């Protein structure tokens, strides 16, 4: 769910093998339905910090108290006033996911409304600087004529049960909803329902009446939510006639432990070792406690890991290893077969890798307020109740992985498959890059557009960047002490048994090895192909910052920060990319995401890395003169003055 985007389905993050993904359970047939034609339009605008109008009016300054409580801090009021001044005729609601990030920037998100109904693909995000003024903002509000008739008064919209049936039939969903059996039960909110009496979905489908901004107008629509495992869909069905699907969003985008330690990507890079008490002691808890009790198994505050051979929705009662002494040491070798013979080692590895990554990201700013995955948020903000569900050896497919990301407060779900391109087959849990790739889908979807909005990477180029961010973090984390900018890396090489990995090119700073440029995105319809271009740019950024600041001690797991700034170039690049996600608008494009990274550096280091960032992007055609157009992009190698 890339933001309820399942990194799966038509854009399975690691499925670029010659043969299609095999599926043994639920999901949309790849041959029958192509939901890419239903993508949301890319209409967001981002006003970077340099372009924000001067704020002389005292009404747009606040005291920077550092307190992100709405009742005592003014940053939400400042953001609201800015929206009123920018779009005085707009009606809207405040989304309840605002927070002050660890860089000191306040992030506030709004949703446009009409007649009290959400216009679901309209967002306005305001970033408030430490000085209390507007730092930057994004906007995709509808600026056309609002329908005069209030559908809530006339009740001239269709039955939500019919909308559910249209979604099922149009998308060929494996859900049964017979009219005589299905009841639409009202839940909290205007025209908001949960369907009872269906079968085939992982949870009861839902529907909410919304407007959708499309083709220059507003279309009343039922937003039908169906979780079918491989896909977690928001299907926008015409609410007037129930005869058309307007758009589709998919949320799915992919003690002591004997494991491949952090930094070892796969069995070709090192050996399994015993790791004792690996969690960061200054964080809230260790990995096996959630405030309610201790779990002597692969369960805790951040994640719950288990096998899932059937590929079904149940997980709480599935098998997971237990150790009263919290010693999770189980046999594994590449020669072992079948995979079920080493399920304990697989589950333990998945639990370990995910928890370490959670802790690293926490230090870099992806914490409770920012929408991370935790059952207990320890009164530090955000919405709890949402650890990551980790399914090892998931039986719903092979040769792939995916991650479903609903909004903050609902658990994310990772499905890790086995790969059959080798003999014996291989388990993706033992390739850290795949696990990190999938979990990063959860990160990018929670940060972009705010933790409560999981559809902000649903446009084609936005979704491509989602794949690129996932590849970037997986690659940055596996760097070795002897690596230089001449070092190239693949993705998915071990699991897929392909020497060149599963991307078109290796990640490289050499333009012969990897010639990708910004304009290569023209004509592409695959988020993974677009993502490789974005990740190639970020790989350039990574090495520019490492060359300036060093890569630090790569044998150390915990990032080292001084005054909130990573002291090495590797973690600095990761931090700037994370902060950029929180700044950029909903449904961003390459140009906007680049500007957000530059703005992130301006906040974090007062712009001291401006030229390193510009040189990275300009090298691959995203320089000063680059212009986004979905059909014909304009490339540029131009650098700003002074660089």
From Swiss-Prot:
Location relative to the cell: Secreted
Signal peptide range in chain numbering: 1-18
Residues the entry annotates as binding Zn(2+): 437, 441
Keyword Ligase: no
The record's free-text note on cofactor binding: Binds 1 zinc ion per subunit.
UniProt cross-references to InterPro entries, sorted A to Z: FTP_domain, Fungal_virulence_M36, Peptidase_M36, Peptidase_M4/M1_CTD_sf
Active site, UniProt feature: 438
Lineage: superkingdom: Eukaryota
Cofactor(s) for this UniProt protein: Zn(2+)
Pfam families given in the database record: FTP, Peptidase_M36
Alphabetized UniProt keyword annotations: Glycoprotein, Hydrolase, Metal-binding, Metalloprotease, Protease, Secreted, Signal, Virulence, Zinc, Zymogen
Function: Secreted metalloproteinase probably acting as a virulence factor.
Xref: PANTHER family: EXTRACELLULAR METALLOPROTEINASE MEP
Family listed: Belongs to the peptidase M36 family.
Name recorded for this polypeptide: Extracellular metalloproteinase 4
Organism: Trichophyton tonsurans (Scalp ringworm fungus)
Gene that produces this protein: MEP4
């Amino acid at each position: 769910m890339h933001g309820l985007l399942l990194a799966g389905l038509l854009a399975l993050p690691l499925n670029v093998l010659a043969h299609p993904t095999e599926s043994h359970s639920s999901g949309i047939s790849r041959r029958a339905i192509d939901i890419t034609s239903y993508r949301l339009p890319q209409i967001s605008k981002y006003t970077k910090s340099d372009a924000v109008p001067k704020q002389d009016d005292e009404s747009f300054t606040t005291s920077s108290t550092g307190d992100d409580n709405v009742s005592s801090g003014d940053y939400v009021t400042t953001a609201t006033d800015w929206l009123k001044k920018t779009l005085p005729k707009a009606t809207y609601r405040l989304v309840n996911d605002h927070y002050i990030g660890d860089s000191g920037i306040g992030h506030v998100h709004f949703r446009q409304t009409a007649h009290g109904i959400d216009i679901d693909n309209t967002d306005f995000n305001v970033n408030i600087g430490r000085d209390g003024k507007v730092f930057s903002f994004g906007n995709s509000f509808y600026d056309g004529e609002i329908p005069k008739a209030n559908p809530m008064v006339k009740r001239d919209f269709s039955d939500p049960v019919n909308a559910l049936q249209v979604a099922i039939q149009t998308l060929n969903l494996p859900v049964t909803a017979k009219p005589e059996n299905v009841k639409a039960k009202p839940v909290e909110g205007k025209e908001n329902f949960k369907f009872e009496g269906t079968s085939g979905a992982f949870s009861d489908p839902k529907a909410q009446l919304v407007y959708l901004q499309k083709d220059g107008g507003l279309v009343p629509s039922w937003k039908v939510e169906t979780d079918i495992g491989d896909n977690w869909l928001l299907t926008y069905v015409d609410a007037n006639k129930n005869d058309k699907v307007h758009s589709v969003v998919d949320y799915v985008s992919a003690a002591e432990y004997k494991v491949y330690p952090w930094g070892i990507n796969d069995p070709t890079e090192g050996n399994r070792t015993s790791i004792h008490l690996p969690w960061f002691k200054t964080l809230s808890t260790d990995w096996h406690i959630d405030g309610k009790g201790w779990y002597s198994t692969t369960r805790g505050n951040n994640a719950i890991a288990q096998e899932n051979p059937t590929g079904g929705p149940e997980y709480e009662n599935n098998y997971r290893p237990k150790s009263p002494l919290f010693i999770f040491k189980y046999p594994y070798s590449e020669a072992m077969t079948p995979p079920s013979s080493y399920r304990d080692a697989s589950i333990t590895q998945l639990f370990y890798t995910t928890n370490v990554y959670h802790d690293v990201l926490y230090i870099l700013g992806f914490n409770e307020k920012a929408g991370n995955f935790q059952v207990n948020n320890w009164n530090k903000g955000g919405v709890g109740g949402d650890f990551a569900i980790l399914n090892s050896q998931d039986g719903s497919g092979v040769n792939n992985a995916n991650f479903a990301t609903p909004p903050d407060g609902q658990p994310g779900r990772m499905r890790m498959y086995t790969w059959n391109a080798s003999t014996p087959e291989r388990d993706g849990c033992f390739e850290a890059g795949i696990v990190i790739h999938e979990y990063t889908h959860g990160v990018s979807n929670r940060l972009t557009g705010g933790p409560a909005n999981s559809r902000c990477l649903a446009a084609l180029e936005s979704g491509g960047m989602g794949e690129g961010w996932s590849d970037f973090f997986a690659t940055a984390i596996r760097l070795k002490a002897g690596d230089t900018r001449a070092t190239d890396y693949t993705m998915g090489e071990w699991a897929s048994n392909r020497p060149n990995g599963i991307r078109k090119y290796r990640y490289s700073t050499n333009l012969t090895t990897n010639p990708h440029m910004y304009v290569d995105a023209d004509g592409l319809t695959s988020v993974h192909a677009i993502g490789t271009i974005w990740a190639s740019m970020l790989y350039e950024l990574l090495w520019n910052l490492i060359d300036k600041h060093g890569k630090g001690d790569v044998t150390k797991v915990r990032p080292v920060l001084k005054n909130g700034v990573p002291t090495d170039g590797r973690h600095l690049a990761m931090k700037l990319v994370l902060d950029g996600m929180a700044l950029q608008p909903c449904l961003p494009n390459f140009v906007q995401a680049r500007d957000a990274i530059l703005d992130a550096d301006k906040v974090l280091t007062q712009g001291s890395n401006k030229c390193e960032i510009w040189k990275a992007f300009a090298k691959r055609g995203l320089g000063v003169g680059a212009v986004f157009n979905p059909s014909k992009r304009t490339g540029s190698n131009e650098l700003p003055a002074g660089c």
